[in-house]
Amino acid sequence: MFVALPFLIFYASFSLLLGIYDARTGLLPDRFTCPLLWGGLLYHQICLPERLPDALWGAIAGYGGFALIYWGYRLRYQKEGLGYGDVKYLAALGAWHCWETLPLLVFLAAMLACGGFGVALLVRGKSALINPLPFGPWLAVAGFITGWKVFFPDG
């Protein structure tokens, strides 16, 4: 556990930073998503080397899954429905959570985002439809909810 503590702090700090940054600006910059991705792979290399292949597949699945959604929507509607920062952030979360947790993480993030959007509609009315809803904060919250499996695999 003591070896994993710096990684836990790193993960929590960068996920919190990304969630807040995306909520304020609508952006998930590479300077935050890339270190989070490499940190997840390094965590598995040092603390759980037997899970490193699952972490690599998690990063690939996270990136590939959201990239398909991004490009499919963009080609169909000629505009972005999902930012490319979200694609890279899910790749980073995949590196931390491994591929098995990603479906639950994405489902939770989508449900949280729907709930947040519903609250925004109730509070602001139709003006909530004008600005796009950042998805990064919901990915961050879902990552924290499912994160117990990453840092406490035996518990």
From Swiss-Prot:
GO cellular-component term (any): membrane
Classification via Gene3D superfamilies: 1.20.120.1220
Molecular function, one GO term: aspartic-type endopeptidase activity
Gene that this polypeptide is encoded by: hopD
Name of protein: Leader peptidase HopD
Superkingdom of the organism of origin: Bacteria
Signal peptide: none
Record-stated family: Belongs to the peptidase A24 family.
InterPro entries with a match to the protein in the record: Peptidase_A24A_bac, Prepilin_IV_endopep_pep, Prepilin_peptidase/N-MTase
